[in-house]
Amino acid sequence: MQSASSLQQQQPQQQQQQQPQQQGQQQGQQAQQQQGQQQQPASQTVQSVPVQANLQHAAAAAAAVAPPGVQQVAPNSPSAPGSLECQWQGCQELCPTPEALYEHVCERHVGRKSTNNLNLTCGWSNCRTTTVKRDHITSHIRVHVPLKPHKCDFCGKAFKRPQDLKKHVKTHADDSVLMRSPEPGAGQRQQPPAGMFGVGLGPDGKRSLGPVPQAYGHPPPQYYQPQHPQQQPNPSYGNVYYAVGHDAAHQASYESKKRGYDALNEFFGDLKRRQFDPTSYAAVGQRLLNLHGLPLPLTHAGAVPEYQPMPAMVGVGGGHGGYQSAGPIPTQSYHLPPMGNLRTKADLMNIDQFLEQMQSTVYESDENVAAAGVAQPGAHYVQGPLSYRTTNSPPTHHQSHHQHPHATATAAATTTAATTASMMSTSAAATPASSISAASRSPHASTPALTPPSSAQSYTSGRSPISLASSHGMSPSHHPSTAGMYPTLPATTGQDSLSSSGYPTTVSSAAPPSTLSSVFDDDRRRYTGGMLQRSRPDIDLSTPSIKRDDADATAGKDEPKLSSSVIDPALSRASVDMDEDAAPHRSPSSTPTPTATTAAAGPDDRQPAGEQQWVENVRLLQRLRDYVLERLNNGDYVDEDKQDDSDKEEDAKSDKASPESASASDAATGAGEYPSIKMHGMEAIAAAAVAHEEGRDDQMPRDDEDQENPSTPTARSTTTMLDAEEEAKQAGENLYPVLKMAVDDDGADTDGDEKMGQ
């Protein structure tokens, strides 16, 4: 039994030993067959070429069936020996790899100049391309040889020549949009691109046509994963960088920023030099018009900052394919130079004051606002619960309504207690003057006793008791309660109102108001300048008019002028003119001024262009003030102490060089001795040479003589040239002979000129 079992164990061992022997014999037979094929005639070798071509087509079909993630055994692989044949004329050598085939053609068929076998004509098939250098022919051979050592780091595509790879890399410049999407996984390709379809295995095990399955993981560096290690970037071209994440439309160019920067600097310089009047609305609007539409370097309102960082960059290359971070890239940042007209703290403070004055001109000047077509004067600034405005900046002065309460109080205290039936139909009884004054001064009184005839309180077309309440310092909260009590009455002339009302004519030279106005007339009143104001007369007071002649004819008696405590000194011209003409001042309600006429126009008559221009000016001034104040708060200015030290050093250097230059200039011009004599060209040069030769000692007596006769230059300038010659001879004719000759020549010339003139 043991022998039988041992025999059974020996039989498998013998069979295992026989199998390698049989395999070796089969390999030997195959090798002999290959050697026999090589020894066969050329006719049989030509017949084997189509067979090899069929094998190559079969290998290509197998590569198309397999997924792209798995690299197939290419014909140029070392495992497929003899698959590449040299097609050079007269050569049929087989090479295992493309590298070996390339080396074979370059060394054997092209040759070298050193070995005296250089061939510059391509003999591959029927090419017959001729070059002038060996490098050119070797580069041309790569076209025929399936050798592609240069691979793209983006898509992995291989190229035969480095110049072909360079051209291909440029096509990936548009692929940078793949990294611009902020969504997660934006760099991935969710679906295979067009043309990435092949033959795969379906669920039933059969071949089916459909999308090729992706063989790479997350994230995909490229379309397929090569099995060989990645090569380093080709040294023939450098890294390529692309800007991502920034839209070019939002990047302001340096030229446009510089243009706005220079315009703003020039504007500040004109402000410092007072090139335009900041109190004139027309001048301010015209000057601000140059700044509209420019990218000003302001730090708010969406303006472009002075410092603009460079966009983030994405590098290409690195050895892993796809897009990669290129590490820290040296950015080239730029900034604009500091403004020359806005450097020191004093400059900033002065500019802020000028801007505030301009802002006050735009806001507070009623005539300018009405001329701009914005609204009626004061419509953009309303006191009380109706406080609404069309702008974002507050007026600079709004507390002047209790500056002069004594003026209207005096007028109210001296008026009579009678009210006419045309003004109030509900009350006709007399009121004592003391109660009127008390009601005027009382802060709890909701309405005044009567409407005073003060034309200095408002220059609008109507008169409202609210004006009196505001002039006495009453709270604006009482205004709405008094507004609804008075209706809007038709306007009458000043003389009718004067004759019908019970107001005495000794209080004011202006005609008392005979009508009431709307609720908003008081809101149109201006509180600027610290004093009461009224509109400018619509005509020139120096020229007579038909209306003034009619007023003079109908005047009953002369009226005294207003007291200086009632109106401001700015209206003294109108008061003096009233005294000269001896006529009562016309009420603005009877003959409205052009400003009032413009203000009385409705919203439909406004000019949209003027209103828009006014709003833009207001916003621009506010932005400029915010910019200046921000620089003051941040300390963004040059220290004045350091600037003074540098100025002192420059002054000291200039003082050292000043004596020599001063003496040379005096000697050249001769201003110290002969200020009235004109010397030009060679005469001035000769005078300077003579003064230098005579020396300091000879000049001292001349200076003494000049001090003794201080009136000599003046007399010489007012007398004739003959008197100048005599005085020059008396002063020292031996000192300056050249100047004497010049004087003689000038005298002769002047005499000739006088004769010619006669």
UniProtKB/Swiss-Prot annotation:
Biased composition (Polar residues): 448-469, 490-518, 709-721
GO cellular component terms, semicolon-separated: cytoplasm; nucleus
Acidic residues bias spans: 637-649
Start-end of Low complexity biased regions: 224-233, 406-446, 470-481, 585-602, 659-668
Keyword Magnesium: no
Disulfide pattern: none
Protein's GO biological process: positive regulation of transcription by RNA polymerase II
Keywords, sorted A to Z: Activator, Cytoplasm, DNA-binding, Metal-binding, Nucleus, Repeat, Repressor, Transcription, Transcription regulation, Zinc, Zinc-finger
Motif YPX[LI] motif 2 in this chain: 736-739
Residue ranges annotated as motif YPX[LI] motif 1: 486-489
Biased composition (Basic and acidic residues): 546-561, 691-702
GO MF term set: DNA binding; zinc ion binding
Compartments in which it is found: Cytoplasm; Nucleus
Known role: Transcription factor that mediates regulation of both acid- and alkaline-expressed genes in response to ambient pH. At alkaline ambient pH, activates transcription of alkaline-expressed genes (including pacC itself) and represses transcription of acid-expressed genes.
Name of this chain's protein: pH-response transcription factor pacC/RIM101
Organism listed in the record: Trichophyton rubrum
